[in-house]
């Protein structure tokens, strides 16, 4: 479990940290908070000119960790191999938004691959929480609009 005293120290420390731009794979620490930039990009989703909506190497997701607690924010991405760095996250925010990120099926596949304890869909226009819930592995709690499904 996360020590709340350490979290207070981390939050206090954030006020005094400098801002740095991270590229894919780079990390920075501020007190007990560690931030790692992860790739976020498209493989299949492309503009009419053939260019991906999100180009590999340009966009980031982020892993924030304090001790053993890990939060993953995927950013604008599809289900890509690099999502493996988020396996077992305590909290994961995954995008579900065609045509720019993941379909329902890809969202479910990515969630079951990562196996976060708590899953929050983001960037969605429409969502069927009951259908998604039925397809998730046991042990993954799904939250939509702040409510557990």
Regions from the PLM with identified roles:
Residues 1-12, 20, 88-93:
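Active-site metal-binding motif and surrounding structural segment of the metallo-beta-lactamase
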Residues 7-8, 80-83, 103-104, 128-130:
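Short, well-ordered alpha-helical microsegments
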Residues 5, 41, 78, 97-99, ...:
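Catalytic metal-binding/acid-base residues of hydrolase active sites
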Residues 1-3, 72-75, 92-97, 118-123, ...:
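Active-site neighborhood of phospho(di)ester-bond hydrolases with catalytic His/Asp-centered motifs
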Residues 85, 91-112:
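Active-site-proximal segments of metal-dependent phosphoesterases and phosphodiesterases across multiple
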Residues 65-69, 89-91, 112-118:
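Short, surface-exposed connector motifs at secondary-structure boundaries
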Residues 21-87, 102, 145-149:
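Core dinuclear metal-dependent hydrolase active-site scaffold
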Residues 11-14, 18-27, 106-108, 112-149:
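Binuclear metal-ion centers of metallo-dependent hydrolases, dominated by the metallo-beta-lactamase
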């Amino acid at each position: 479990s996360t020590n709340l005293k350490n979290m207070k120290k981390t939050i206090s420390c954030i006020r005094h940290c400098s801002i740095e731009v991270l590229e894919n794979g780079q990390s920075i620490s501020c007190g007990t908070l560690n931030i790692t930039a992860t790739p976020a990009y498209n493989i299949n989703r492309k503009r009419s000119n053939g260019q991906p909506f999100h180009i590999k190497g340009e966009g980031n997701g982020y892993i924030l960790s304090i001790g053993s607690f890990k939060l993953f924010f995927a950013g604008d991405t599809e289900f890509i191999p690099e999502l493996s760095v988020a396996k077992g996250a305590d909290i994961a925010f995954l995008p579900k938004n065609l045509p720019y990120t993941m379909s329902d099926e890809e969202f479910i596949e990515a969630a079951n691959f990562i196996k976060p304890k708590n899953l929050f869909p983001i960037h969605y226009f429409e969502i069927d929480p009951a259908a998604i819930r039925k397809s998730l592995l046991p042990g993954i709690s799904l939250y939509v609009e702040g409510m557990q499904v």
